[in-house]
Regions:
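Membrane-embedded beta-barrel scaffold of Gram-negative outer-membrane proteins
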Residues: 314-329, 333-341, 499, 529-608, ...
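Acidic/polar loop-and-plug regions of large Gram-negative outer-membrane beta-barrel proteins
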Residues: 219-223, 231, 236-317, 332-365, ...
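Structural signature of Gram-negative outer-membrane beta-barrels, strongest in the C-terminal barrel
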Residues: 365, 380, 384-396, 433-558, ...
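Surface-exposed extracellular loop regions of Gram-negative outer-membrane beta-barrel proteins
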Residues: 258-272, 395-400, 490-537, 542, ...
């Protein structure tokens, strides 16, 4: 266990003092009625910190809830945050909170994160509160309007994540025709990546009941690391018909990514064992300093991925107190080439000599999702109820082939070797049917309010049914679980100050004991029962004007599988526990200066394990302390000009489960500027951003045990938008 250092404590006090005051479908989430367009001033009143954070969040089975009335830790980053930071993907948006750790490199085609010590993979990102409908790999911001992060497991709000993530729920909200818009944009990144796009929205009809929004983007060129060339394109359509009683939506997106000549890398420091070859492990076993963030260890790589989606949804209000809703959607995803597995292993820590190899994988997925529900409001005496009943359905069918590999090739951590003879495999197996999974759940919620909203209670439960088939191994598995939840919000002094407590659970599929994962197990073929992760949380929230201040304390307990060393049976009574404290503050210090800051302390450890020496150790990739500070200043003497800065600090984190290797702490500084003016009567906004201003060389996090993630080097981005 690490100690809470004096340096960390000093940083905490300082920040606390400063924080005083594709084709895409929207399912049956509540959509804002749009009888009239909102002015910018009205929109700002619905947000914190000069429009960067939303005051309301869309929370799946609970509907739309204000942040102050939600008994969980939830943050929604708005379109303004996305545009001012020029974030290209959801993962780049999440960098506003350093406690959300990336477990894949910046710029990787697969974006995975860690929240509160537990992973959230890209397969478990969702669109508009539902799983299975997000693009493969990563979500480009060109198709979305906001990003909501609900920290910790929450089966009540979102159901069981199909890949088993329990660290949190990452929900992207798609674009909607909220107001008339005709926008053309262009951007340039250092090394020659150019991108252009358009975004057009209209409200039509006598009462503005019809909405249309169409957008697209295309980018191509070298960026992020030396020689890596990307070609990216998106297209999105959103249609809606909105009246006081009826809401109908149609959405579609298409996303394409093509990558050549490079990929960000994970670097392995693997302890040697008798079973490993010299090219598969590290000697002497120690950590090396990080190389330059723009190093390219895979110059002959190629990969591409695509996603497309269609769907429709509707909602009808029979009265102000009763409504029904339904939705359905279809998603196709595929990838081919060397998309992931971009890893090298350091063989000699004295010289930096390393080895790696190229892979080729293939994957296709078809997913269907649907929901049906109703919501009614009624009173029982002095208690106001909002009762919800909802059914959700998701099926995922996918095909894949085993990875084809090339021969291992030599390289060097500090001097990557370029050898044209080392190429990706040219032959590979045929894609075959692999998995057919079905998830059905039923949710019942009762949101109660009494004493003029001074006391609010959420009671809920989700019944989850799981049916999985491995078509390749010809195995089947079915199980079900009930996940109860309880939330309490108390406002004894003011409607702007709340205290809350909650208990929620998260569900993950039980592990299947196979020859590959447990070759010596005595219970091969058995699938363990679904894991129930439990979270207990206490907190307080205070809002005043543009300010939101939050404080949360939590504990998460997650069961884990392990193999008993005596019986050789695979069991599921190991446990990882995470405890932490999180503080955030956001608002306007003055009319011209806004702030977003956050602090987090986490103690994540293995409390039960099949390896006795591991008990009490810190979970890999979980820094004890993270801190972030973002400032945005409007320069009074230059109308339309503003500058912004963001500093992120991450303390030390362990690379392996025995805690013998530790990644150093680091601080990253990002700078930006924006200038809004009119050119020829056209509203024009120029933006410039520099990430990692000081070009730090650092290990940003942990991909998996013994694999460090190489942090991105300094990058530049220039952008301009024209609003006609």
């Amino acid at each position: 266990m690490k100690t809470f250092s004096k340096k960390i404590l000093t940083s905490s006090i300082g920040l606390l003092m400063m924080g005083g005051g594709c084709l895409q479908l929207t399912f049956a989430e509540e959509v804002s009625v749009l009888p009239a367009l909102k002015s910018e001033a009205q929109a700002q009143q619905q947000n914190y910190a000069d429009g960067k954070l939303a005051k309301e969040a869309k929370l799946g089975a609970l509907g739309n809830k204000s942040v102050i009335d939600t008994p969980f830790s939830v943050t929604t980053y708005t379109a303004k945050t996305i545009s001012d930071t020029q974030a290209a993907t959801v993962s780049e948006v999440l960098k506003n909170d350093p406690s959300i750790r990336e477990t894949t490199n910046s710029g990787h085609l697969n974006e995975n994160v860690q929240i509160r010590g537990f992973s959230v993979g890209f397969e478990d990102y969702n669109i508009n509160g539902l799983y299975g409908m997000a693009p493969t790999g990563r979500i480009p911001t060109d198709i979305i309007d906001s990003v909501t992060v609900l920290k910790g497991p929450n089966a009540l709000v979102a159901g069981m994540a199909p890949a088993g993530s329990v660290g949190g729920v990452v929900m992207a909200q798609t674009k909607r025709a909220n107001q008339d818009l005709t926008r053309v944009s262009a951007s340039y990144e250092d090394d020659g990546y150019y991108k252009s796009g358009f975004d057009v929205a209209r409200r039509l009809g006598n009462n503005k009941e019809f909405g249309v929004r169409v957008g697209g983007s295309y980018g191509q060129g070298e960026h992020i690391i030396d020689g890596m060339d990307d070609t990216n394109s998106t297209g999105v359509v959103a249609l809606d018909y909105t009246t006081d009683k009826l809401k109908l939506n149609f959405d579609a997106y298409a996303v394409r990514d093509k990558r050549d000549n490079g990929s960000p890398a994970m670097v392995g420091f693997i302890p040697c064992t008798p079973k490993l070859k010299a090219s598969q492990c590290t000697t002497p076993y120690k950590l090396m300093d990080a190389p330059s963030g723009d190093s390219n260890f895979f110059p002959n790589i190629h990969g591409e991925q695509s996603s497309q989606y269609l769907g429709a949804s509707g909602e009808y209000k029979f009265s102000p107190d009763f409504k029904v809703f339904a939705g359905a959607g279809y998603n196709e995803k595929e990838y081919s080439g060397h998309i992931f597995g971009t890893r090298l292993i350091v063989n000699n820590t004295n010289t930096g000599a390393a080895s790696s190899q190229y892979y080729r994988v293939g994957y296709q997925e078809h997913a269907v999702a649907a929901n049906l529900g109703l919501e009614g409001k009624f009173d029982t005496g002095a208690i106001q109820h909002t009762l919800g009943l909802r059914a959700d359905y998701l099926t995922r069918n996918y095909w894949q082939h085993s990875a084809a590999t090339s021969n291992a090739f030599d390289t060097n951590l500090y001097d990557p070797i370029v050898d044209a003879s080392e190429q990706m495999p040219t032959s590979y197996p045929t894609i075959v049917p692999y998995v057919d999974n079905r998830y059905v759940s039923y949710t019942l919620t009762d949101q109660m309010s009494m004493l003029d909203d001074k006391l609010q209670v959420i009671l809920g439960a989700r019944y989850q049914d799981i049916d999985t088939q491995n078509l390749y191994k010809k195995t089947k598995y079915s199980s079900d679980k009930l996940s109860p939840s309880l939330g309490l919000v108390v406002k004894p002094f003011s409607e702007d100050l709340s205290f809350y407590a909650s208990y929620v659970e998260g569900l993950s599929e039980g592990v299947t004991v196979s020859d590959i994962t447990y070759p010596t197990a005595t219970n091969k073929g058995e699938t363990l029962a679904p894991y129930q992760t439990k979270q207990y949380e206490l907190g307080t929230k205070y809002q005043v004007g543009s300010w939101l201040n939050t404080l949360a304390l939590y504990q998460i307990e997650k069961p884990e599988a392990y193999q008993d060393s005596t019986s050789l049976e695979v069991k599921d009574d190991a446990e990882t526990r995470s405890r932490g404290i999180e503080f955030s503050t956001a608002g306007q210090l003055t009319e011209d200066l806004s702030l977003m800051a956050n602090l987090a302390y986490i103690d994540a450890e293995y409390v039960k394990s099949g390896t006795a020496s591991q008990v009490g150790n810190t979970v890999i990739g979980t820094p004890d302390f993270t801190a972030g500070l973002g400032l945005d200043y409007k320069i009074p003497v230059v109308d339309g000009m503003s500058v912004n800065a963001r500093a992120s600090y991450v303390s030390e984190q362990y690379l392996n489960t025995d805690n013998s290797l530790e990644l150093p702490d680091y601080t990253i500084l990002d700078l930006g500027a924006k200038y809004a003016t009119k050119i020829g009567g056209v509203n024009t906004t120029f933006r410039a951003n520099v990430n990692n201003l000081t070009d730090e060389k650092y290990w940003s996090g942990v991909f998996g045990s013994n694999y460090a993630i190489l942090g991105a080097g300094r990058t530049y981005k220039l952008g301009v938008t024209f609003d006609f």
